[in-house]
Structures are given as C-alpha cells and as structure tokens.
C-alpha cells in the first residue's frame, strides 16, 4: 500500500514529505478554500514538494466544462490528476480525459457499483469514502472489500484510494483488504506514527544510558 496525504496545507505536506513516507497528495475544493489562498499557487507549491500524483478537483458539473477545467489543471504540472465527481456527467468527462491521456480520480464513491462504472469509464483511481459511510451507520470498509475482488477478477488497472479516513484503524483495515492507496489527513498520519509504549520504551532507554554513559 502507498500513503497519500489528504490536505492542501503546504506546511503539513512538507512535514509529511520529510518523513519519506508519502507518495502523493489529494486535495478538494473544501481543503483548498480552508487555506484562503490562490488555487493554482497552492497546486504549484505542492508539485514542487512532492514527486507523485496530486489530485486537484474540478468544480464544474457538466462534462464539457469538467473536461475544459481538467485540461487546464493538467497543464499546471505532469503529476496533476483530475478529480471528478461520481455523477453521469463525470463519467463522460472521465472517458474524454482518459482518451486524452489525462489521469483521473473519481471521487465521492460510496458503492462498488459506482467504482465499477468509474473503472469502465477509464478512471486511473477511484476514491471510496470510508468515513462518510461510517457516519451514516454503513460499513465504509465493506465497500473496499467489495471493490477489490471485482477489480482483480476483471483485470481493471484502476487503483483504489481509501478516502475519508478518520483514524488509523481505517488505514490498517484498508491495507488488509487490499486497497492500493490510503489518503490520510496529517492528524491521522501523526496518530499512526505514535504509540505510548514507544515513548515509554525510549524514555527508559535514555534514562538507563544516562546512568552509565560517563563510566
């Protein structure tokens, strides 16, 4: 499994990238708006930091507009992946963008049926939203469990990005189920890094060393 970071905050991206563990970035209009900065500038900054796929989402809702917006976004940097919502017009846009050699990430996926249609349209990635399904008392991870064998059965090259990650267990289970990627908020990434026994063990090692280092 690969780990992407789900944020538009450049400082968070720098910090995560310095750890040497992230392979890409996902953003969305809400994350961009939270930064209160020019969209293109943020995407260009991210592309200068991370050498991997960077998902940037369209805000149009008709296929021709999504395609035009996607072409414009893709021109910013070769690593840009166009995020397209899982709607009928979105599938049309995915088909056209894919035909032009532009990578796509179909977002707001909440069922295996939606993921199947996105793969058939030629999506590079699909992003099932685990946490949002959990929020309405559905099993978000079950959707990943449903998608993985379908894609394997028919040899789809579309990669599965576990999205809407709320806690480290989501990442662990998505990895266990066979998702290709988990896109993780910075806060959850830091939670994955830490364990109280690691801190306790390190403190003990250092304390023991202090007792003998000058002997």
Curated annotation (Swiss-Prot):
GO biological processes: carbohydrate metabolic process; pentose-phosphate shunt
Pathway, per record: Carbohydrate degradation; pentose phosphate pathway; D-glyceraldehyde 3-phosphate and beta-D-fructose 6-phosphate from D-ribose 5-phosphate and D-xylulose 5-phosphate (non-oxidative stage): step 2/3
Predominant cellular place of this UniProt entry's protein: cytoplasm
SUPFAM superfamilies in the cross-refs: Aldolase
EC code(s) of this entry: 2.2.1.2
Pfam family, any one: TAL_FSA
Active site location: 83 (schiff-base intermediate with substrate)
Reactions listed under catalytic activity: D-sedoheptulose 7-phosphate + D-glyceraldehyde 3-phosphate = D-erythrose 4-phosphate + beta-D-fructose 6-phosphate
InterPro entries: Aldolase_TIM, TAL/FSA, Transaldolase_3B, Transaldolase_3B/F6P_aldolase, Transaldolase_AS, TSA/FSA_arc/bac
Entry GO CC: cytoplasm
Entry's localization field: Cytoplasm
GO molecular function terms attached to this record: aldehyde-lyase activity; transaldolase activity
Keywords: Cytoplasm, Pentose shunt, Schiff base, Transferase
Stored CDD domains: Transaldolase_FSA
Protein task: Transaldolase is important for the balance of metabolites in the pentose-phosphate pathway.
Family, per entry: Belongs to the transaldolase family. Type 3B subfamily.
Name of the protein in its database record: Probable transaldolase
Organism field: Moorella thermoacetica (strain ATCC 39073 / JCM 9320)
Gene: tal
């Amino acid at each position: 499994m690969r780990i992407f970071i789900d944020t538009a905050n450049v400082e968070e991206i720098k910090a995560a990238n310095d750890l040497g563990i992230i392979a890409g970035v996902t953003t969305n209009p809400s994350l961009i708006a939270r930064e209160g900065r020019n969209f293109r500038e943020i995407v260009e900054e991210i592309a200068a930091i991370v050498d991997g796929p960077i998902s940037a989402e369209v805000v149009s809702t008709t296929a021709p507009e999504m395609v035009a917006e996607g072409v414009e976004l893709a021109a910013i940097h070769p690593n840009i992946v166009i995020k397209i919502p899982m709607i009928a017009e979105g599938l049309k846009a995915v088909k056209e963008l894919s035909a032009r050699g532009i990578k796509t990430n179909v977002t707001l996926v909440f069922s295996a049926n939606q993921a199947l249609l996105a793969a058939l349209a030629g999506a590079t990635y699909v992003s099932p939203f685990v946490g949002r399904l959990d929020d309405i008392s559905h099993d978000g991870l079950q959707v990943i469990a449903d998608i993985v064998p379908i894609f394997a059965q028919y040899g789809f090259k579309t990669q599965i990005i576990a999205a809407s990650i709320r806690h480290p267990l989501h990442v662990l289970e998505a990895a266990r189920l066979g998702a290709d990627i988990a896109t993780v908020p910075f806060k959850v990434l830091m939670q994955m890094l830490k364990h109280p026994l690691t801190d306790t063990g390190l403190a003990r090692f250092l304390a023991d060393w202090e007792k003998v280092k000058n002997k």
